[in-house]
Amino acid sequence: DWPSSTNPEGQRAGVHALFCLVCEGCEEIFNALSDKEEANFAHLCAEQLKKHVYPHNGLKQALALQVLAGLVDANEAFDELLGKDGVHGFSTFLGYYILKALGQADRVDFALDCVREYWGAMLDLGATTFWEDFDINWAKNCSKLDEILPEDSQKTDIHGDFGGYCYEGYRHSLCHGWASGPAPFLMEYVLGVKPLEEGCKKVLISPSLGNLEYAKGTVPTPYGLIKISLKRETDGSVKTEFSAPAKIEVVLG
């Protein structure tokens, strides 16, 4: 993404990891289509790509993608970089993949803290939709979106004074879907719903409440909504209730 473009070495590592994920995704699609020849080719491509791991050069986005591609152990990545300095180094688009990598390391509580700190800072500044870009350092001594600054103000304008690349200043979009990573992360790792077969004919429900007291949500499927409710009991255990359409096979994790 744009914010990672200043780190070419890390960017190379991230693109390589993405290519691995693409080949694995293609293998899965071709298997679903019963095209064994193309599935085998995609599998071989992924195997060849995974024989080399590029250095991430301190880029959290690249290391997160390497975790998701199976190139790097999730817990080692957390200890080395992903668990350090809070949300410094996050970006709106690839922040989702950092959250996923944290989920794979069983650090849902830390990931939720990151959501509060990074996306929560946008809310504190008046956001009503997801922003195209955001750096946590912008939040220091800046105005809210609906605040009119006097000419002699010592504050910065959160909209007009930041942004970059092709979206400097007021060209910076304050309604950008690519920054909505917390939404799927909450479905996948807190509610814990993940498809196991194409078309959601079979799904895994393996919730993790993290440091939340409760969570409730729905996940859409071709057969209707899966509904899940999680609540922490006084003894620390988590009560899980769910319902799923009859045509969906549910596996509890």
What are these regions (language model features)?
Residues 69-72, 102-105, 134, 190:
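Generic structural signal for hydrophobic core residues of well-folded globular domains
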